[in-house]
């Protein structure tokens, strides 16, 4: 976010959002803008405040507020309020702890096998719940999985600004596969089909989880990190070919063998295929 916008947001700190929420400090950013730690000045409870400038040509926070309202479940932050304040769209939600990405970095890019197994089970449960609501996340990455609190080992899934319905709850009709040529997500973890610009479905969220686990097991390194091209399309094309031609047996040789089994299962899933719990 530009310094001019940041300065405008700093001015907003002296005001109250919705009459009672005040920004305390910036704690991160999402697919929409900045995330702040805030406080409800009435009950003194801390909250997370997401801020998106209204004139950016999109409204991801409105979309996210709709999804959060309809999700309501274990491991999903509570939507407290959403609306407009001055030049900004503002979403208030539960304040959570640090992301797996930040914890991983603080721990010198290392997680124990026990830790990875414990949070992987929760991550799969979270994405299964999201999928049960006919929703795909489309931006699976360590920064979008947070710990609830220091004394609570509960994993939360966040940031639904890029999410999409894959099936109509009214007609039960699945979206159709197509090559959109527009990539959505984070290329480092995105599925092979997503990186090549294909419409995403449940299988793509699962494949992205697999790349995230490979990242953790390999000390925070994946073969396509650092790929640089003048055009984004060229970069995505290069990453696509690197992922497509990855030798799992070689790259995952020091990881649990289940990683290879899992990745091969994800790669074989058909576009509309419902995920078999026994395989994950």
Question: Which residues fall in each region the model found?
Answer:
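Conserved N-lobe ATP-binding subsite of Hanks-type protein kinase domains
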Residues: 34
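Structural motif in protein kinase domains
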Residues: 96-105
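Activation segment/activation loop of eukaryotic-type protein kinase catalytic domains
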Residues: 148-184
């Amino acid at each position: 976010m530009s310094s001019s916008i940041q300065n405008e947001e700093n001015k907003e700190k002296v005001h109250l959002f919705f009459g009672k929420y005040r920004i305390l400090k910036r704690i991160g950013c999402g697919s929409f803008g900045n995330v702040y730690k805030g406080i409800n000045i009435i009950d003194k409870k801390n909250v997370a405040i997401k801020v998106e400038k209204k004139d950016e040509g999109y409204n991801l926070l409105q979309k996210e507020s709709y999804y959060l309202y309809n999700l309501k479940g274990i491991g999903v932050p509570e939507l407290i309020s959403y609306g407009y304040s001055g030049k900004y769209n503002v979403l208030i939600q539960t304040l959570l702890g640090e992301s797996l990405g930040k914890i991983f970095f603080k721990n010198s890019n290392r997680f124990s096998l026990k830790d990875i197994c414990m949070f992987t089970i929760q991550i799969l449960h979270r994405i299964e719940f999201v999928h049960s609501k006919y929703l795909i996340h489309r931006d699976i990455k360590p920064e979008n999985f947070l710990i609830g609190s220091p004394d609570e080992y509960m994993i939360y899934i966040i940031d639904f600004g890029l999410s999409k319905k894959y099936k109509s709850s009214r007609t039960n009709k699945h979206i159709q596969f197509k090559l959109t040529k527009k990539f959505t997500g984070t290329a480092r973890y995105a599925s092979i089909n997503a990186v090549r610009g294909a419409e995403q479905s449940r299988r793509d969220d699962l494949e992205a989880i697999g790349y995230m686990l490979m990242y953790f097991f390999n000390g925070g390194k994946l073969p396509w990190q650092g790929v640089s091209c003048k055009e984004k399309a060229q970069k995505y094309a290069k990453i696509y070919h690197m992922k497509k031609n990855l030798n799992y047996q070689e790259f995952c040789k020091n990881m649990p063998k289940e990683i290879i089994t899992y990745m091969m299962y994800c790669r074989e899933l058909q576009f509309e295929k419902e995920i078999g719990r026994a395989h994950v």
